[in-house]
Amino acid sequence: FASQENMAKWLPLPLYFGGSEHNTMHLLYSRFITKALRSLNLVDFSEPFLGRRNHGFIFGPDGQKMSKSRGNVVDPDEQVSKYGADTMRMYFAFMGPYDQNYAFNFDGVLGVRRFLDRFWNFVQNHTNKKLKIADNPKINLVLNKSVKEIGEQIKQHKFNTGVSGLMKLLNALDKLVGSDGKLETVNHEMIVKLIAPYAPHMAEELWMEVLGNKTSVHLE
């Protein structure tokens, strides 16, 4: 029927993502087929997925379902061209809980764009390859706390609170390092790794071009 080795490696899948309409469509079909295969002793599991997460929907700026007739359609290609793919990716993550519905908000997009600009400038302005990482207990405390919290939020699919955590981290580092940079440089590699899942393109450029690493941040 199928490679036992491959089935043991890949199945059952850890998580199924989709809209609520999948509950009576693809999810239902896959569960039915899996149970049939189980009854024939062709697989040794009864459920194809170990978990299920519904995603929400994004409506037009007017709070209504996007429609050409309503004139409220937001062209994703146009937004990416204007603000960048990382901005849109982080904006969608920041809108709120993953399973809720939201109206598209242009001011929210601009807010995320400004944050990414601040993040980029912070890493550039406080990077000095001749200096060692500042051994500052306050900075280390903030960084370690953020790594733990944001990492857990990503695992729990609380992407919006993860972005909020990054914003709080940048605000805290701005205050601790100061505009004159007297605290030398902070562990930029750590904060670039933290932002990489949300802004992969910017993180890669900072990682390689500014911080001088030779391999991708996404391989770390």
Give the ranges of each region predicted by the language model.
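Helix-rich, typically C-terminal accessory recognition domains appended to large enzymatic cores
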Residues: 28, 45-46, 78-220
